[in-house]
């Protein structure tokens, strides 16, 4: 029988299910966590977009159609376009646009911007407006999720973060917030001559593409012992997971989780 550790404070029913799954399985086991609004409160990529647009830092002026010679107008149009795409239900297009904001930067410059974003956001959760768009403010860890990650790690379960955000941004944030993960998979920028381009390696870690990423980067055949997400944009991974955990944000995923009797934390 596996030597199961029980010290972490998590939901007793969830803990029992984890122990049950560990006993059933053999060989290496893994769990997959979304990052934004799952491991942390709010979204590191959206926060970084706010920082970039506030400070007018975009370098690639070919990301939107039209005449983009007016720098102030371009930043306004970029952030408004992103949130309008989400509002219109064009999730894939919105997610693909926002991760292009690092186009024209070096990796080191992008990492610095993300770090400055985290420091400027602080931990007080609230909201503000930028260019008429309501923007979430503040970044902090989700303590219940971190306890769950630590419990899984304690029991030798590999923890992978699989996010639709820029892999660069998530890597900086996990390091800053000291989140213990074995692997980070996000949107992988194509870098040419040291400069980030507006193109990405496939498969894209967006919507159903998350499963393709899991099969390419984690396991071709095995499925997660546990999957955790905050939104129905991650439902493809949750559907493959033996234990399904939703972060309760009173959204569509919350309704699905309650209906299907998934765990909510």
List where the protein language model places each region.
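Residue-level preference for alpha-helix termini and adjacent loops
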Residues: 39, 101, 189-190
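Generic structural signal for well-ordered beta-strand positions
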Residues: 40-41, 197
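C-terminal cap/substrate-recognition subdomain and adjoining C-terminal extension
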Residues: 2-13, 17, 23-30, 112-115, ...
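Preference for short coil/turn "hinge" residues that link or interrupt alpha-helices
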Residues: 33, 95-98, 172
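Non-catalytic pre-domain segments flanking phosphatase-related domains
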Residues: 1-35, 42-46, 50-64, 68
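A metal-dependent, Asp-based hydrolase signature
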Residues: 44-45, 52-53, 57-136, 143
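A generic alpha-helix surface/boundary motif
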Residues: 43, 92-93, 168, 208
